[in-house]
Amino acid sequence: MGKNFYSIMLSLAGICQSIVLVNQLSETGECHSKSFEICIDSMLNLYPTTVLSIYGNKEKNLKLGITTLMSLLNVNAILKCKNSIKMIRYIFNLITLENRLENNIKYKNILFKELSILIQQHKNRVYTYDLLADRLAQIYLDTVSKLGFRIQVSGSKKVLHNIVIQNKIRCILLSGIRATMLWKQIGGRRYQFVFYRNSIFHYADMILKKINDTKYS
């Protein structure tokens, strides 16, 4: 059970890393660049051996997601942060989208096929992260956007009218759906946010302390 909670925590951190990047992009047009690249990389590994392997086998690659997860599991922190409710809404919207994708064989297969093609092309040519983001955004439009449910991203109207930002947000939402798939595959369920909040918080806190340890690399 301990190992399972660890994996569940990591997958939730992956989800949270995605939604906090979406929030940053929608508000300012910018986001934590390293975490953005990690989210893109997470979609280029279709056959992971573990949850952590999707994120470069380094817990520190999920630091932003872990800190966000901890804040969303802390009732007092939620009340103090105006964006917390919005990010919680994004999480449950991602769960809804993932459910729709899982039940739609056509678009699920298209998504897998398009990602496989992109991965092979990337191996042959090595795309930049900007180009990968554009390609992943198009895959999102070709699949997830056709599921009949859309995540309403709120933020700066000026920023959200920028096509480059729109593509980055779609790309990151796709990585959030991927993380949600992982979360469900390893036993993640909605009720855990209520009944196992403390256990998940404990594992997140433990890993964050290890990441922040100067001896940890």
Swiss-Prot record:
Main location, first listed in the record:
cytoplasm
What is the membrane topology noted in the UniProt record heading this document?
A: Peripheral membrane protein
Q: Matching Gene3D superfamilies, A to Z? A: HflD-like
Which cysteines in this chain are paired by disulphide bridges?
A: none
> Which superkingdom does the taxonomy of this entry point to?
Bacteria
Keywords, A to Z, come to: Cell membrane, Cytoplasm, Membrane
InterPro entries, per the entry: HflD, HflD-like_sf
Q: Which SUPFAM superfamilies match?
A: YcfC-like (SSF101322)
Source organism of this protein record: Buchnera aphidicola subsp. Baizongia pistaciae (strain Bp)
Q: Where in the cell is it found?
A: Cytoplasm; Cell membrane
Family, per the entry?
A: Belongs to the HflD family.
From the broadest rank down, the organism's phylogenetic lineage runs: Bacteria, Pseudomonadati, Pseudomonadota, Gammaproteobacteria, Enterobacterales
Protein's name in the database: High frequency lysogenization protein HflD homolog
Identify the stretch annotated as signal peptide in this record: none
Q: Does the keyword Nucleus apply?
A: no
GO CC, sorted alphabetically, is: cytoplasm; plasma membrane
Tell me if Protease is a UniProt keyword of this record. no
